[in-house]
């Protein structure tokens, strides 16, 4: 009282002004799995705050447990105000229809807080009635209700004010009571508590609850579960214990800081399953969804930490594979849910078929469960056909998003069949140099400007390695289940041609793939054929061997002083991307990693790759191996990565996962001392 206004979170104009000066608040962050505590100390106001934020386990709420401590030697009167803006709509509306969508808001002050229920949501797809309720509520530590509220931005900020310098706080304006209804305004979770007197060394506690619900009574029940300090502390302990148990991998490397960092890395896949790829609605991958690779890479980590549900996840994820070997790119929120892209032909990433087998192979190695390859899964179906080169005009919403037979039945094939479709279609989709076409991009999303003529040697290596390992799995399967034949869709016989002359003939390979995709353009026969294990193993092995020998023979730029490496790509002008030219040495790490990992690189070549990578890519100053050398060119015939500053993102940065894969590849091949 009469001393000023202090932000316990540091979100005030005064706090901003004091940054980097002697008057700046002292602060300390302590973070754990799904919770964090921030302490602040104000020398000026002689107050200390401790704010613990956590996400509840079973409820759609985030809770802030706040402690305000008087460190002065005299009594202090304080009036606590909590302020959380309630945006209450899609992140898209930050740019589109921001003002108009605020007019949809129906705001109400309740006993403990503010609720906002927009009447509807709308965009270019249409109008939808809204059922969600956004709310911010609060209580004193003993459970006492707030005394008043600031339910709109206008009421809180005031004319000319800001969130960091609000009129309601600085002029101590009275709030509104419970029971007030307001329509068509930007909403604010402004909560004012009764003034209290803090004696020296005394602490007051408060709880702020933020959440989303579908029913009014659900809001009341949620608030009642957390409306006191005791309830909030108990919920916090539950959260801490749960996630400590869930993230159950521990690391002991001799470097305790690194060990703790790896615990956070282990936690990240859980965050991605819950929140998607981004937690910031307007930063980078702001839509926050998960992609095809995320599904499979999350399974990899969960195999170590939460293996119980992984089998069903793996089987369900195969339902995203199309009969032409491509896959759905819009992932639903439920297990095995995939959504059709109705905006025309969607982008095809040529690496997408690599990851399902890599994940399944780790699952097999961990469990010995080869029977999973005989589990049945559906195939995804939408209007996209011909591996993203055609539209199936006969497909409709009524057809549904599962591949059907000519008789109208939803077709199911084994996981093994899905893997064969993915890899065999990729085998035949080649460019001018008989390497697999790059299409929209591969693992490196920024190689996105060579869709017509680009080729990815790097991932051609990866597919070859997968084909060879899939043959190994079939041998294991043959021994374990005592079976001599496998059942496959009749149309797949087209892809099972085993003819070396065909492999060398680019046009013939492309024609064979066209024949298959045309046959499967809309419906499939549903008829089955029996294929012997021995012939299938031989078929896959021949294809893998041919790819590897072809790459060894045609994609090796030989350097000086026993240096050499594999060319990783061809650009849209059909030129090799790597090698030695007038512009200097051009080398990329990706092609080396997959050549080594797949078995394409010979031991002699690995030695030369290591020497070249150490020479051209390793940079101790940035912490490891760069993704590529500096091409000193924009390369509009390859991808946007060359527009990034060198050393940023895909253009020459140290990509931790690729350097880890490089280490793993060397380890697998016996090159780690």
Question: What is the meaning of each model-derived region?
Answer:
Residues 1, 319-328, 380-389, 487-502, ...:
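Short, mixed-charge aromatic SLiMs
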Residues 1-296, 305-320, 332-333, 346-370, ...:
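Anionic coordination/interaction segments
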Residues 97, 220-221, 330-331, 370-381, ...:
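Short, glycine/acidic-rich hinge or "gate" loops at secondary-structure transitions
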Residues 193, 217, 237-256, 261, ...:
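Long, charged, mostly alpha-helical binding arms that flank functional sites
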Residues 281-295, 340-350, 446-460, 575-599, ...:
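Solvent-exposed loop and edge beta-strand segments that line ligand/cofactor-binding
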Residues 295, 302-310, 314-432, 457-467, ...:
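Aromatic-rich carbohydrate-recognition surfaces in CAZymes
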Residues 328-341, 388-403, 494-512, 556, ...:
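Charged/polar, low-hydrophobicity segments characteristic of intrinsically disordered regions
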Residues 543-557:
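Metal-assisted phosphate- and nucleotidyl-transfer catalytic regions
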């Amino acid at each position: 009282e009469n001393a000023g206004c202090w932000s316990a979170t540091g979100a005030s104009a005064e706090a901003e002004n004091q940054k980097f000066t002697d008057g700046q608040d002292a602060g300390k962050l302590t973070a754990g799995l799904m919770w964090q505590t921030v302490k602040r100390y104000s020398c000026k106001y002689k107050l200390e705050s401790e704010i613990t934020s956590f996400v509840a386990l079973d409820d759609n709420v985030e809770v802030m447990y706040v402690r305000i401590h008087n460190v002065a030697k005299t009594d202090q009167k304080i009036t606590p105000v909590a302020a959380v803006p309630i945006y209450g709509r899609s992140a898209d509306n930050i740019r589109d229809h921001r003002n108009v969508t605020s007019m949809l808001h129906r705001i109400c002050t309740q006993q403990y807080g503010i609720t906002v229920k927009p009447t509807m949501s709308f965009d270019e797809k249409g109008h939808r009635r809204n059922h969600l309720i956004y709310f911010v509520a609060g209580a004193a530590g003993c459970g006492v209700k707030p005394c008043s509220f600031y339910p709109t931005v206008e009421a809180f900020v005031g004319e000319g004010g800001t969130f960091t310098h609000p009129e309601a706080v600085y002029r101590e304006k009275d709030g509104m009571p419970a029971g007030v209804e307001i329509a068509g305004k930007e909403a604010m979770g402004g909560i004012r508590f009764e003034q209290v007197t803090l004696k020296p060394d005394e602490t007051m506690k408060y709880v702020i609850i933020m959440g989303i619900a579908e029913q009014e009574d659900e809001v009341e029940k949620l608030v009642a579960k957390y409306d006191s300090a005791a309830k909030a502390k108990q919920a916090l302990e539950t959260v801490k214990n749960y996630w400590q148990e869930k993230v159950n991998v521990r690391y002991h490397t001799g470097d305790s800081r690194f060990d703790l960092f790896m615990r956070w890395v282990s936690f990240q896949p859980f965050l991605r399953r819950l929140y998607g790829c981004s937690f910031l609605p307007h930063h980078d991958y702001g839509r926050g969804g998960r992609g095809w690779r995320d599904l499979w890479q999350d399974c990899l980590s969960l195999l170590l930490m939460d293996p119980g549900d992984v089998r069903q996840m793996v089987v369900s994820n195969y339902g995203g594979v199309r009969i032409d070997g491509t896959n759905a790119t819009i992932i639903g929120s439920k297990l095995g849910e995939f959504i059709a892209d109705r905006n025309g032909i969607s982008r095809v990433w040529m690496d997408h078929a690599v990851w399902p087998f890599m994940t399944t192979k780790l699952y097999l190695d961990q469990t010995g469960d080869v029977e999973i390859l005989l589990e049945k899964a559906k195939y995804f179906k939408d209007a996209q056909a011909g591996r993203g080169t055609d539209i199936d005009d006969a497909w409709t919403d009524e057809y549904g998003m599962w591949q059907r037979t000519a008789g109208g039945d939803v077709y199911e094939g084994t996981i093994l069949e899905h893997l064969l479709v993915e890899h065999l279609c990729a085998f035949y989709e080649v460019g001018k140099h008989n390497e697999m076409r790059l299409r929209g991009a591969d693992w490196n999303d920024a190689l996105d400007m060579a869709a017509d003529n680009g080729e990815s040697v790097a991932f051609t290596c990866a597919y070859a390695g997968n084909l060879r390992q899939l043959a190994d799995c079939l041998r294991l399967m043959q021994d374990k289940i005592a079976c001599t034949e496998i059942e496959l869709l009749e149309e797949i016989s087209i892809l099972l041609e085993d003819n070396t002359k065909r492999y060398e003939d680019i046009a013939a390979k492309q024609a064979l793939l066209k024949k298959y995709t045309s046959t499967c353009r809309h419906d499939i026969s549903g008829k089955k054929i029996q294929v012997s294990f021995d012939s299938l193993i031989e078929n896959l092995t021949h294809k893998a061997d041919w790819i590897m020998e072809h790459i060894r023979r045609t994609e090796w730029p030989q350097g000086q002083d026993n240096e050499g490496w594999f060319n990783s790509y061809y650009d849209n002008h059909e030129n090799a991307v790597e090698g030695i030219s007038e512009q200097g040495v051009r080398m990329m790490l990706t092609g080396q990693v997959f050549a080594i990992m797949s078995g394409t690189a010979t031991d002699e070549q690995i030695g030369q790759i290591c020497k070249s990578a150490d020479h051209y890519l390793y940079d101790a100053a940035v912490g490891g191996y760069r993704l590529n050398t500096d091409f000193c060119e924009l390369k509009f015939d390859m991808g946007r990565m060359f527009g990034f500053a060198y050393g940023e993102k895909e253009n020459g940065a140290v990509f931790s996962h690729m350097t880890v894969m490089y280490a793993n590849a060397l380890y697998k091949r016996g090159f780690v001392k």
